[in-house]
Amino acid sequence: MRNEIRSLRTAHGLSQQQLAEAMDVSRQTINSIEKERYTPSLPLAIALARYFGTTVEDAFHVDNSS
């Protein structure tokens, strides 16, 4: 699943650690989401989208190419 979390985070001037603390997850979790190695749970995806003032659909993109 592709996502816009890195671009949203950097546009808001946040480090991975700052975002992790705001979401109550580890920095490694944020890093894994940004590198698309980990798909967040629905509650975390919603929390991330709300934090950045966007929708889950705009923050995360399902890749249907396979």
Regions found by a protein language model. Name each.
Residues 25-38:
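Recognition helix of helix-turn-helix/homeodomain-like DNA-binding domains
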Residues 35, 54, 64:
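Short, conserved catalytic or interaction motifs in soluble domains
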Residues 3-22:
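Short basic helix-loop element that most often maps to the first helix and adjoining turn
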Residues 50, 58-66:
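Short, charged recognition helix plus adjacent turn
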Residues 18, 29, 58:
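Residues in the helix-turn-helix
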Residues 37-47:
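Short, basic-rich loop-to-helix N-cap that marks the start of a DNA-contacting helix
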